[in-house]
Regions:
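Carbohydrate transferase catalytic cores enriched for Leloir-type hexosyltransferases
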Residues: 1-360
Length: 360
């Protein structure tokens, strides 16, 4: 996509330099939109915070803050802002609350989101959460889905990038409680007990555990208790190119999360032709559509049956592959950028008009 033509009102975009899916959002927009950028990490030292505050104080144009954690900066700004909200996990999912520091940050985020001129939500589910938990009026919210880089995430030749020579189920994400990895481990243990052809099946887990070492310890302890520790492989960091190969080689992505603002691995897997099994809650039915097997994330029997379908039924696998590839076409960063650009024009140009002095 060519870079979008200049917007009527110059806009500054805060770009997070880290590597999560949320951080990628701002990086992909920066490639495609005619914005000036301010680079920062999601978590700042005191020195970085002071430097960022000074930059904001000098800004003479509207600002797009690309995730809800940056909403705390809205009161520092002298110009209108748009805040993107990716999820409200700390409000919607109680296990995500992490003490007084988190509570203080959440309070500041809430203040900023409410004071923003407009809010982007990455799914209708997140929009509903925003209206429910923060009482933000619907007319102040626009839903713009995330995208996927189809130049990277596309079907690849079968090869051994994962290091696993056995057929494998794939999970991509952290080991935080809301990700529901424990349920996947229990379902995997049950299906391994069914013998051939499941006895050769492995589980590949890609991504760091999360901010707490306790998450990985809990995963390993549960795997040991279930007797499947030797059947699980952990891969901490991979490049996007390597991840695309891993998706393409997997029997299926199994993503039984209890709460997602969007669920980027679902679309990445579909774009690579990987069958997807995911939850029927939160944003996941919205994002997956009819192109995945949707299961109750609290029901290990339902998860086992979905895995059996994908492993044993070639027709099921082929259908999920074809429908997933078609569904993934609906999510591109070009489309995300174009919708964001249109919102800049509507919100910021409208505000500029309101602020302009009348003649006479």
């Amino acid at each position: 996509m060519r870079r979008t033509e200049s917007v009527h009102v110059p806009v500054s975009l805060l770009v997070s330099t880290e590597g999560s899916g949320i951080d990628r959002y701002s990086q992909e927009l920066a490639k495609r939109l005619p914005v000036s950028t301010i680079s920062t990490g999601r978590y700042q030292s005191i020195r970085q915070t002071i430097s960022l505050a000074r930059q904001f104080a000098l800004l003479k144009q509207p600002v797009h803050l690309p995730n809800q954690h940056f909403g705390r900066w809205v009161p520092w700004l002298n110009h209108p802002s748009i805040v993107t909200v990716h999820d409200l996990v700390r409000l919607a999912f109680p296990f995500a609350k992490e003490g007084w520091i988190s509570a203080m940050g959440l309070a500041r985020d809430r203040t900023g989101i409410r004071k923003a001129a407009h809010v982007i939500c990455v799914s209708e589910a997140t929009k509903r959460d925003l209206m429910c938990y923060l009482d933000v009026p619907e007319e102040k919210i626009t839903v713009i889905h995330n995208g996927v880089d189809h130049h990277v995430f596309n079907p690849r030749q079968k090869q051994d990038s994962s290091g696993s020579r056995s057929p494998y189920l794939l999970y991509v994400g952290s080991e935080r409680p809301r990700k529901n990895l424990g349920m996947l481990l229990r379902a995997f243990a049950l299906i391994k007990q069914q013998g051939h052809p499941f006895d050769s099946l492995a589980l590949l887990k890609v991504g760091p555990a999360g901010r707490s070492d306790a998450f990985r310890k809990g995963t390993l302890d549960e795997a040991h208790r279930l007797g499947i520790k030797s059947d699980i492989q952990f891969v901490e960091q991979v490049s996007d190119q390597e991840l695309a190969v891993i998706y393409s080689n997997a029997v299926a992505l199994v993503f039984p999360s209890l709460y997602e603002g969007f669920g980027l691995p679902v679309v990445e897997a579909m774009a690579c032709g990987c069958p997807v099994i995911t939850s029927n809650v939160s944003s996941l039915p919205e994002i997956a559509g009819s192109a995945a097997l949707l299961v109750d994330p609290h029901n290990s029997t339902a998860l086992v049956e979905a895995i059996r379908c994908v492993v044993l039924d070639p027709t099921c696998r082929a259908r999920l592959r074809v429908q997933g590839l078609l569904r993934a076409r609906d999510f591109t960063w070009d489309r995300t950028a174009e919708a964001t650009f249109a919102l800049y024009q509507r919100v910021f140009a409208h505000l500029e008009t309101e602020a302009a002095p009348s003649n006479g």
